[in-house]
C-alpha cells in the first residue's frame, strides 16, 4: 500500500489569515502537509522529516518582533519557501534588512520576474498578476540572497538564496487572486522539494480503511450521525472498513430541515444498508426549550440534551469500544489555536459529536487530517450523493437558532415549509451553488397582509443568502428581484402562517451569517 505521508511538507505558522490556504494549495498539488506553530520545538522539526518547509505570512513586523524562524529550519538542508513575513524573517536572519514601507500594499499587483531560469518560476511568463498584503518590505537582501522578481511598490518581490534551495516571495501565491499561484506552489513542492504526488482520494480511502481496520480490530464502533457532511462521510468510510461493527445513532431533534430525518434514513439505512438507530426526540427538545429566548441558552440546552440522549442510547450497545467523530483538520488547527486565543466568544460552538466524560470509549477520528473540501471529495469517492455533500452549511442547533426567541412546534413547522420553498427554487433556477449559504429565518412578530379578499395577520419570514470564501466574512447575495418575488409569493400563498417575507441585505461584518 502507498504511504501517503511518505513525502510531506511542514508549514510553520506565523499567524497569517492565509495559512490554511497554503496547506490546501499544497494538498491540491497532491502532497501531504501539516501546519504547526512557528515556535514548535527544534527536535520536532528535525524528526518530522519534511521534504520541504514553508514559512507563512504573519501580522507582525520582523524588526519589532522576536518572532523568527527556528534556526534548525535553515540547517536541515531541505528547501525552504518564505511567504511575506516568512520571506522577510528568512532574509533578515541571513543578514538582510527589512523596513516599514512608505506605503502599505494590499491588493493586486504586477510583478516582473527577472530570472525565469529559477525553478520557483518555471513555466511562467515574465509578468505575473499577484496578491500583495504587506506593510513592510525588504530593503537589503544581504550577501546570500538575490532578487528574482520585483514590482513598482516592492522592488524585492521575490528572492532566491545564491547557494541553497531557499526562496522567498513578498506576495501570497496561496490566494486565488495570484493568477499562477498554484504553479508556484507546485514548482516548489514537486520540482524543488522532489515530492511525489501521493495525496489523492483513492490513496486516502485505501489508507483510511487499512488504518481503521488495524486500530479497531473486531471491536464495535458508535457514531453520532447528524446528516451533516462530516458525520455522513465518517459513516461511509467506517461502513466500508468494518461493516456491521458500526452502529450509528441518529438523534432526530425535530429541529432539522423539512423531511431531513427521513432523507438521512433513506441514504444510510436503506441505500447503504448501515445499521442506524433513529431516536425521535422532538418532544424532549421542545419541552427543554419551552420559554427559553436567549440564543446562547438555546445552544447550550440543545447541545447538552443531544449528548445526554446520545449517551443513553450508546449505553445500550453492548461491547462498544470506540466513539467515532467527524473532526476535520480545520477543527484540529482551531482547537490548538484557541488554547492560546484571547478572542471574545461571539457564539458558542455546538459540537454535536461531543465526547461525554462518563463514557469509557476510545476516540476514532478518520477525517482529522482532511480539510472540508477533501472530506467532500472523499464522500464522492465513497458513493455519497453530490447534493448531500455539497449542500449549504447547517448549524449544529439546527432551526433552533433560526427561530428568534422561544421555539414552538408551530414555529418549527412554519419555518421548515418556508425554508424548503426557498431551497427548492434556488435549485430550480440553478442558483443554489452560486451562493455559499441560504436559508429562512422565523421572526416571532406578526404583520398585516391581504390574501384574496381576506385580511391576514400572520408571521414574518426573513430570507438570508450570502456569498463567502471562508465564512469569516461574507457579502449578501444579489439574487434577482424576479426570483425573490417568486419565492415570496410562494411562501405567502403556500404557508398559511406567513403574511410577509423580507430579504436580509446585511454583510458579515457587521452582521453574523446566522441571526442568532
From Swiss-Prot:
GO CC terms in record: cytosol
GMPS ATP-PPase domain sequence ranges: 199-391
Pathways per UniProt: Purine metabolism; GMP biosynthesis; GMP from XMP (L-Gln route): step 1/1
Domain Glutamine amidotransferase type-1 per the UniProt entry, residue ranges: 8-198
Signal peptide (residue range): none
GO molecular function: ATP binding; GMP synthase activity
Superkingdom: Bacteria
UniProt cross-references to SUPFAM superfamilies, sorted A to Z: Adenine nucleotide alpha hydrolases-like, Class I glutamine amidotransferase-like, GMP synthetase C-terminal dimerisation domain
Binding site for ATP: 226-232
Active site: 84, 172, 174
Native source organism of the sequence: Francisella tularensis subsp. holarctica (strain FTNF002-00 / FTA)
Family annotation (NCBIfam families): guaA_Cterm (TIGR00884), guaA_Nterm (TIGR00888), PRK00074.1 (NF000848)
Catalytic activity: XMP + L-glutamine + ATP + H2O = GMP + L-glutamate + AMP + diphosphate + 2 H(+)
Coiled coil: none
Protein name: GMP synthase [glutamine-hydrolyzing]
Quaternary structure and partners: Homodimer.
Pfam families reported for this sequence: GATase, GMP_synt_C, NAD_synthase
Purpose of the protein: Catalyzes the synthesis of GMP from XMP.
Record keywords, A-Z: ATP-binding, Glutamine amidotransferase, GMP biosynthesis, Ligase, Nucleotide-binding, Purine biosynthesis
Entry EC no(s): 6.3.5.2
HAMAP family: GMP_synthase
Amino acid at each position: 500500500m502507498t504511504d501517503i505521508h511518505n513525502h510531506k511538507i511542514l508549514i510553520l505558522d506565523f499567524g497569517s489569515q492565509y495559512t490554511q490556504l497554503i496547506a490546501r494549495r499544497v494538498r491540491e498539488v497532491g502532497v501531504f502537509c501539516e501546519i504547526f506553530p512557528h515556535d514548535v520545538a527544534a527536535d520536532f522539526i528535525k524528526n518530522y522529516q519534511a521534504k520541504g518547509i514553508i514559512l507563512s505570512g504573519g501580522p507582525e513586523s520582523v524588526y519589532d518582533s522576536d518572532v523568527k524562524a527556528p534556526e534548525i529550519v535553515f540547517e536541515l538542508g531541505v528547501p525552504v519557501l518564505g511567504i511575506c513575513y516568512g520571506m522577510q524573517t528568512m532574509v533578515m536572519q541571513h543578514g538582510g534588512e527589512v523596513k516599514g514601507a512608505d506605503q502599505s500594499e494590499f491588493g493586486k499587483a504586477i510583478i516582473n520576474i527577472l530570472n525565469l531560469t529559477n525553478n520557483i518560476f518555471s513555466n511562467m511568463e515574465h509578468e505575473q498578476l499577484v496578491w500583495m498584503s504587506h506593510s513592510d518590505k525588504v530593503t537589503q537582501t544581504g550577501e546570500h540572497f538575490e532578487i528574482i522578481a520585483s514590482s513598482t511598490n516592492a522592488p524585492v518581490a521575490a528572492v532566491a538564496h545564491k547557494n541553497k534551495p531557499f526562496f522567498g516571495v513578498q506576495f501570497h501565491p496561496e490566494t486565488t487572486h495570484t493568477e499562477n499561484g498554484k504553479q508556484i506552489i507546485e514548482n516548489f513542492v514537486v520540482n524543488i522539494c522532489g515530492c511525489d504526488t501521493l495525496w489523492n482520494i483513492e490513496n486516502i480511502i485505501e489508507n483510511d480503511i487499512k488504518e481503521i481496520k488495524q486500530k479497531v480490530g473486531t471491536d464495535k464502533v458508535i457514531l453520532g450521525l447528524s446528516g451533516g457532511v462530516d458525520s455522513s462521510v465518517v459513516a461511509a468510510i467506517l461502513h466500508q472498513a468494518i461493516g456491521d461493527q458500526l452502529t450509528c445513532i441518529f438523534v432526530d431533534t425535530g429541529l432539522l430541515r423539512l423531511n431531513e430525518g427521513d432523507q438521512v434514513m433513506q441514504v444510510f439505512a436503506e441505500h447503504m444498508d448501515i445499521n442506524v438507530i433513529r431516536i425521535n426526540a422532538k418532544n424532549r427538545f421542545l419541552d427543554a426549550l419551552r420559554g427559553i429566548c436567549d440564543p446562547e441558552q438555546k445552544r447550550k440546552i440543545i447541545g447538552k440534551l443531544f449528548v445526554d440522549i446520545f449517551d443513553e442510547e450508546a449505553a445500550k450497545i453492548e461491547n462498544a469500544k470506540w466513539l467515532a467523530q467527524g473532526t476535520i483538520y480545520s477543527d484540529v488547527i482551531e482547537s490548538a489555536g484557541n488554547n492560546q486565543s484571547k478572542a471574545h466568544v461571539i457564539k458558542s460552538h455546538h459540537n454535536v459529536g461531543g465526547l461525554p466524560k462518563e463514557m469509557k470509549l476510545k476516540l476514532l477520528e478518520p477525517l482529522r487530517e482532511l480539510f472540508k473540501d477533501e472530506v467532500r471529495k472523499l464522500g464522492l469517492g465513497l458513493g455519497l450523493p453530490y447534493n448531500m455533500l455539497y449542500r449549504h452549511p447547517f448549524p449544529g442547533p439546527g432551526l433552533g437558532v433560526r427561530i428568534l426567541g422561544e421555539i414552538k412546534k408551530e414555529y418549527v413547522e412554519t419555518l421548515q415549509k418556508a425554508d424548503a420553498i426557498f431551497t427548492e427554487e434556488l435549485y430550480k433556477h440553478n442558483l443554489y451553488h452560486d451562493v455559499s449559504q441560504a436559508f429562512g429565518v422565523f421572526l416571532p412578530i406578526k404583520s398585516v397582509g391581504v390574501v384574496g379578499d381576506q385580511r391576514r395577520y400572520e408571521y414574518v419570514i426573513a430570507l438570508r443568502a450570502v456569498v463567502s470564501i471562508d465564512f469569516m466574512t461574507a457579502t449578501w447575495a444579489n439574487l434577482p428581484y424576479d426570483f425573490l418575488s417568486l419565492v415570496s409569493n410562494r411562501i405567502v400563498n403556500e404557508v398559511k402562517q406567513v403574511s410577509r417575507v423580507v430579504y436580509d441585505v446585511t454583510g458579515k461584518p457587521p452582521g453574523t451569517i446566522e441571526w442568532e
